[in-house]
Amino acid sequence: MARDLVMFRDVAIDFSQEEWECLNSYQRNLYRDVILENYSNLVSLAGCSISKPDVITLLEQGKEPWMVMRDEKRRWTLDLESRYDTKKLFQEKDIYEMNLSQWKVMERIKSCGLEGQESPHEVCFRQVTKTTSGKTPTYRKLTSLPLYQKSHNREKPYECGECGKAFRVRQQLTFHQRIHTGEKPYECKECGKAFRQCAHLSRHQRIHTSDKLYECKKCGKIFTCGSDLRVHQRIHIGEKPYECKECGKGFRVRGQLNLHQRIHTGEKPYECKECGKAFRQYAHLTRHQRLNIAEKCYECKECGQAFLCSTGLRIHHKLHTGEKPYECKECGKAFRVRQQLTLHQRIHTGEKPYDCKECGKTFSRGYHLTLHQRIHTGEKPYECKECQKFFRRYSELISHQGIHIGEKPYECKECGKAFRLFSQLTQHQSIHFGEKPYKCKECEKTFRLLSQLTQHQSIHTGEKPHDCKECGKAFRLHSSLIQHQRIHSGEKPYKCKECKKAFRQHSHLTYHQRIHNVT
């Protein structure tokens, strides 16, 4: 059976600069994915090397595709009789051609610019009309041909058999299914890292080529995509434009809001086929499945602890070997992980790129800002199932739970003292070593713990960030505020076993107990 030749331009979509600037990052990524995937398919079908179109070269380099628009003087004749399968999109000086199957993608990308309502059984040729305002181009109808109704009524006919998620374009379903299969056909020749989509590989390769990288001026973090940098910068300015209508909580990224809303709806679309347990996020399902499959875990031969990835095991193994390859040039302190060194160096530089919008307090880590903001919001997301007490930090919950079980698995080899948390053991061991790595720049006093230095520095600054909501009195330390609040609440948690007298502070109880010891 004879076959018609397929040219790359038959499965391509072209944009002018004006059109390209009207697309958001999601629409641009969709365009890149479709074009790169189509080119990949043509190469595989050809079975031999073919010349690479300029637009593919630009997309692989992360550049804008409109840079290869056809010659302005070149015009093609619209001939529906001889080219019935092809639609043509005219602009004043440029003419672009696309295949019928790709028209549906174009329809989706440009749907925000439609004027009026067409028949649901028609797909229209439209002419782009340039606008002086720079907004999304408008369109006027030239002619029409029958097409599926789904292009207009926004149906999603392509459904994933694994999780039920539906898509308007078959190509999107193909990309999505690779999440379930784990297929990552696009591999970086420089570092071996693999990706599900060709566009993701192209963006990654900019790291190696140093082509058009975007650096955050606040913290120095590097991004290969401008949109990723813009999203990241919201961490520093505290911007959270996506708000949940149910509880008012804000998010930096729309995807985070979508995941959060499942808490209110109770939706758990990802189900484990082994045990039937369902999850709100696919990442949670993946983690659950890997925990259930022993052969996929990475186990430490020294202590038997298992990890979900080999990287985690390698970092953990340094605990046993004592290896700390990343050393601070200022104080000589060494770290197992480079990221720990980067964060540590901010102690010396004084860099605190994360600002609280409520009180202006700055932090060296984004996570510390997140925890701090819970003081203002009152959020305590971690609940103890034993006593229903809530905590702002997960570490506080874990530490608290040790009270119920009485377990203290981390023992100091120097003195035999045991602790519930490994971090507590690490802090304690600095007593034996005499190590005090945290120095106050004002008075040169040194401290074992960063928290001690932070508390001390408030003496110099006069800062009292902890306010009593009852009387407005402010305190340097949160513990001082807790003690003060007992005046208003009348709480006296420290009771003398001899005479049953109760006290607000433990020091008061200790002082009182001397009476009984004397007698």
From Swiss-Prot:
Q: Which SUPFAM superfamilies match?
A: beta-beta-alpha zinc fingers, KRAB domain (Kruppel-associated box)
Which domain of life does the protein's organism represent?
Eukaryota
Q: Which residues carry this modification: Asymmetric dimethylarginine?
A: R75
A Gene Ontology cellular component where this protein is annotated is: nucleus
Cite the location of the cross-link Glycyl lysine isopeptide (Lys-Gly) (interchain with G-Cter in SUMO2) from the record.
K110, K141
CDD domains from the UniProt entry: KRAB_A-box (cd07765)
Keyword list (alphabetical) reads: DNA-binding, Isopeptide bond, Metal-binding, Methylation, Nucleus, Repeat, Transcription, Transcription regulation, Ubl conjugation, Zinc, Zinc-finger
Molecular function (Gene Ontology), one example: RNA polymerase II transcription regulatory region sequence-specific DNA binding
> Per its UniProt record, what PROSITE patterns does this chain match?
KRAB (PS50805), ZINC_FINGER_C2H2_1 (PS00028), ZINC_FINGER_C2H2_2 (PS50157)
Q: Among its keywords, does the record have Ubl conjugation? A: yes
Q: State where the C2H2-type zinc fingers lie.
A: 158-180, 186-208, 214-236, 242-264, 298-320, 326-348, 354-376, 382-404, 410-432, 438-460, 466-488, 494-516
The subcellular location is:
Nucleus
Briefly state the protein's biological role.
May be involved in transcriptional regulation.
UniProt record similarity statement: Belongs to the krueppel C2H2-type zinc-finger protein family.
Protein name per its UniProtKB record: Zinc finger protein 30 homolog
